[in-house]
Amino acid sequence: MAIKRTKAEKKVAYDKKLCQLLDEYTKVLIAVADNVGSNQLQEIRKGLRGDSIVLMGKNTLIRRCIKVHADNTGNKEFLELMPLLVGNVGLIFTKGDLKEVREEVAKYKVGAPARVGLVAPVDVVVPPGNTGLDPSQTSFFQVLNIPTKINKGTVEIITPVELIKKGDKVGSSESALLAKLGIRPFSYGLVITNVYDSGSVFSPEVLDLTEDDLMEKFASGVSMVASVSLAISYPTIAAAPHMFLNGYKNVLAVAVETEYSYPHADKIKEYLKDPSKFAVAAPVAADSGAAAPSAAKEEEKKEEPEEESDGDLGMSLFD
């Protein structure tokens, strides 16, 4: 016969378990567990078994344990979890990939009926079509202003109807109608709201970022740093190439306007004094590109006389 532990003993065991998890793990997912049943939670635990542990409990108890652990070990990083312990939340300690764990948790959402008084997490739309209900059930549709018609002895909804809006409470009429139609519009499961990793807390959307997204953000940041550096004339690695180029342009402009001379500036001065050189430079590039085809044509012309001489030689044999 199992010995029933007292409330104090349970609290001591819980503190010991949580402190052990804080020592072993550096990654934690904070999840809201509203409307999640014990059987559903058990299935989630089974699915995560191996590299993750789901811990539920009272927020005050978890806060106290985290604070005691920080005082005893000197590790203050987990104190970042304290402000996140609000409402019906649980902690998922993991050694696996954070994104994969979040995706695994999302698999265990289950459909739920629209019970009276629940706040709708999503819009509920009743689709058009045959309901399979007999004409005596039309009162439900009339109360909710749903257009219907009788088709082959059953009630048929003519157009799609937005029955419940997101954020509204479910009324008795809406709940009864959805139950008769066999519609379970809501789905509940653990919802990851925050991610903790080695002292840093961030939104779960960060887990969806790809390498391309990071490279785009990095390139945008480098471009912004370069722009600011150029604007305030502050040298940085990002702005250095542009600063050298702008400086060279300024030196070249001064050399062109004055008698100061150096090889590159002299060449620019020649072009500015005689603009026709710009026109001469372009055909030279074009001619070099056309040289190869013309050479090929000349070779073909040289080969043609050889074929004609062979023909003449053949004709002379018959003479």
Swiss-Prot record:
List where Low complexity composition bias occurs.
286-295
**Keyword Cell membrane on entry:** no
Listed A to Z, the keywords are: Phosphoprotein, Ribonucleoprotein, Ribosomal protein
Q: How is it modified after translation?
A: Phosphorylated.
Q: In which tissues is it expressed?
A: Highly expressed in stems, inflorescences and immature seeds (at protein level). Expressed in leaves and mature seeds (at protein level).
Q: What does this protein do?
A: Ribosomal protein P0 is the functional equivalent of E.coli protein L10.
| Region called Disordered, residue ranges | 286-319
Query: What protein name is recorded for this chain?
Result: Large ribosomal subunit protein uL10
Q: Which GO terms describe its cellular component?
A: cytosolic large ribosomal subunit
Name the gene behind this protein.
60SP0
Q: Which GO terms describe its molecular function?
A: large ribosomal subunit rRNA binding; structural constituent of ribosome
Q: Name one GO biological process term.
A: ribosome biogenesis
CDD domains under this entry? Answer: Ribosomal_P0_L10e (cd05795)
Q: What is the lineage of its organism?
A: Eukaryota, Viridiplantae, Streptophyta, Embryophyta, Tracheophyta
Subunit details: P0 forms a pentameric complex by interaction with dimers of P1 and P2. Interacts with NSF.
